[in-house]
UniProtKB/Swiss-Prot annotation:
One of its GO terms (cellular component) is bacterial nucleoid. This is Nucleoid-associated protein YaaK. Homodimer. It is found in: Cytoplasm, Nucleoid. The gene is yaaK. Binds to DNA and alters its conformation. May be involved in regulation of gene expression, nucleoid organization and DNA protection. Keywords: Cytoplasm, DNA-binding. It comes from Bacillus subtilis (strain 168). Its main location: cytoplasm. It comes from the Bacteria.
Length: 107
């Protein structure tokens, strides 16, 4: 029985360390900034690791009052690219904590 309690305490310490490490990794992710671009760099969207849009940069020459739809499409494409990159770095960073566990959609 004693060995079981020792193992339980060891497992609890490991879980606490993992929680602490995960929290630190999430803080680091929040500080990372990724960019998504569209139209050959005519539109750039910057997002952080928490999927917050930080900046939208639109080059003047892409603004055509006659073709707002194109500009909207470029902003949408750049935003989606930035968010996809956030997902990639999140999965890469947080994946180290879930190796071997089947937890789809956790992050």
């Amino acid at each position: 029985m004693r060995g079981g309690m020792g193992n339980m305490q060891k497992m609890m310490k490991q879980m606490q360390k993992m929680q602490k490490d995960m929290a630190k990794a999430q803080e680091e992710l929040a500080e990372k900034v990724v960019e998504g671009t569209a139209g050959g760099g005519m539109v750039t969207v910057k997002a952080n690791g928490q999927k917050e849009i930080l900046d939208v940069i639109i080059k003047e020459e892409v603004v055509d009052p006659e073709d707002i739809d194109m500009l909207q499409d470029l902003v949408l494409a750049a935003t989606n690219e930035a968010l996809k990159k956030v997902d990639e770095i999140t999965n890469e960073t947080m994946g180290q904590f879930t190796k071997g566990m089947n937890m789809p959609g956790l992050f």
